[in-house]
Curated annotation (Swiss-Prot):
EC numbers: 2.1.1.178
UniProt-recorded Gene Ontology molecular function terms: RNA binding; rRNA (cytosine-C5-)-methyltransferase activity
Protein's UniProt name: Ribosomal RNA small subunit methyltransferase F
Active site, renumbered: C245 (nucleophile)
Domain of life: Bacteria
Keywords: Cytoplasm, Methyltransferase, RNA-binding, rRNA processing, S-adenosyl-L-methionine, Transferase
Lineage of the species this protein comes from: Bacteria, Pseudomonadati, Pseudomonadota, Gammaproteobacteria, Vibrionales
Length: 478
């Protein structure tokens, strides 16, 4: 795929000095020039792995399991007519296109089938790991998904929405603020740190065009600040995973050792030798995974699992929050909203969520978020479920993506032609209307092959399209 991939000579000389004895440079260079296998992760918030495998087989997709992620698969699929990203399964959130090695940090975070109430994803966009965490949390507790680059928060939200995540709170800060603003708040923290990207040449032949040793050192300084802040944000007894898609020891082992030197006995490295079969092929003496691309035929990657054994003194910070624009709904309001949602949409408000109001907008926040409200300014929290109007509530798209299952009484199955029309933003006139379904007025879920794809409104014998404009596609659909 990339026989002419650019690899600086100075970088190759550096790799020669850190390559483990059982590996060789010829294989390293050959693997960098080899095409990266495409991989996907099944989104178990929407579908079981077993049900997805049946759908994949029917489509002629060949899947082989990723050993470190029981929902991850390498995929061989004919994309000459329809790219994977334009398949109905992808658009309805049944799977996420995710590089196999990037599934490993989240698997390490949940290595022992842990259950966490509060998780921080420090550098979250575009959302592959965030949605993976949400699935392992089963949409319970709270997941704070932070992204420093404002331009990427929109993409992060789009992926969270598509995948049916409802326990997330999004923020847009430099990751270095969390230790001071939310000290010892999280049961688990993922720090997938910004890095020099030395492991990504199989995906991007120009990834190393601007590589210099001085830039590696500069990035490592930022990573040390980030890992300190992440450690401060972690509760005593909590677990942090530090990961990068780079190979240099300055950005990997040395960052972890910096944490140990800074906080001493409060830091414990936990071995990842049992994370998956043959993990020892990439294991360092500390128990980290330092993955060169030829070992598992994937991107270069680094993963460390770290436990915080004792509390540490939080940094002193000043912060100005401004007025919080939401108010908690009264018991009466909450009961009325829950009643109408049940009566009109056959949906129950989740027990671990609370209704909050901002002007006419109605939101559901995860209960586990409440201790953080007023401590950090979030750009988006939970899911928007309705807008209040004089005649009741107008339900929103996230009721379909995050709350509906497809088994609701007012969910109607579309044909493939109708589903294509729907994704192109057009109203549909369904051919197959169940005899017991009331038509003519009211809101209705639409689904395709059993998966919910949106929320519309009956207008006579047609369903008015309620797809948000940013989700409308115009061609090349399944």
């Amino acid at each position: 795929m990339h026989p002419n991939v650019y690899i600086p000579e100075a970088f190759l000389e550096k790799i020669q000095t850190i390559l483990p004895a059982h590996l060789n440079m010829e294989d390293f260079i050959a693997s960098c020039q080899k095409p990266l296998r495409k991989s996907i992760r099944v989104n178990t918030l929407k579908i079981s792995v077993e049900a997805f495998l049946e759908r994949a087989e029917a489509k002629g997709w060949k899947l082989s399991p990723v050993p470190w992620c029981n929902t991850g698969f390498w995929i061989e699929a004919d994309e000459s007519v329809v790219p994977l990203g334009n398949t109905a399964e992808h658009m309805s959130g049944l799977f996420y296109i995710q590089e196999a090695s990037s599934m490993m940090p989240v698997s390490a975070l949940f290595m022992n089938d842990e259950s966490y109430d509060a998780v921080l994803d420090t550098a979250a966009a575009p959302g592959s790991k965030t949605t993976q965490i949400a699935a392992l949390m089963n949409n319970e507790g709270v997941l704070v998904a932070n992204e420093y680059a404002a331009s990427r928060v929109k993409v992060l939200h789009a992926n969270i929405e598509r995948c049916g995540v409802r326990n997330a709170a999004l923020s847009n800060f430099d990751g270095r603020v969390f230790g001071g603003w939310l000290p010892e708040q999280f049961d688990a923290v993922l720090l997938d740190a910004p890095c020099s990207g030395e492991g990504t040449v199989r995906k991007d032949e120009d990834a190393m065009k601007n590589w210099t040793q001085s830039s590696v050192v500069e990035i490592a300084d930022t990573q040390k600040d980030l890992i300190e802040s992440a450690f401060h944000a972690l509760k005593p007894g909590g677990v942090m995973v530090y990961s990068t898609c780079t190979l240099s020891t300055e950005e990997n082992q040395q960052v972890c050792h910096h944490l140990k030197e800074t906080f001493g006995d409060a830091v414990e490295f936990e071995s990842l030798k049992d994370l998956f079969e043959n993990a020892e092929a990439a294991l360092t003496e500390e128990g980290f995974l330092h993955i060169f691309p030829q070992v598992y035929d994937c991107e270069g990657f680094f993963v460390a699992r770290i436990r915080k054994l004792t509390a540490v003194e939080a940094p002193k910070v000043k912060k100005r929050m401004g007025k919080f624009p939401f108010s908690k709904a009264s018991n009466k309001e909450s009961a009325e909203i829950a009643k109408q949602l049940q009566n009109t949409m056959d949906i129950k408000v989740p027990e671990d969520s609370t209704v909050w109001i901002r002007e006419k907008d109605v939101w559901l926040f995860p209960d586990a978020l409440e201790p953080m409200i007023g401590e950090l300014r979030f750009s988006r929290m939970g899911i928007k479920i309705a807008e209040a109007h004089k005649n009741g509530y107008r339900w929103q798209h996230q009721v379909a993506t995050a709350l509906a299952t497809g088994d609701e009484k007012n969910a109607i199955e579309l044909t493939i032609e109708e589903a294509r029309e729907w994704y192109m933003g057009r109203d549909v006139r369904p051919q197959n209307i169940p005899a017991d379904m009331k038509t003519g007025k009211g809101e209705v879920f639409v689904k395709y092959e059993g998966a919910i794809i949106g929320l519309g409104k009956w207008v006579s014998n047609r369903i008015k399209n309620g797809l948000p404009r940013e989700l409308v596609r115009d061609k090349n659909l399944f």
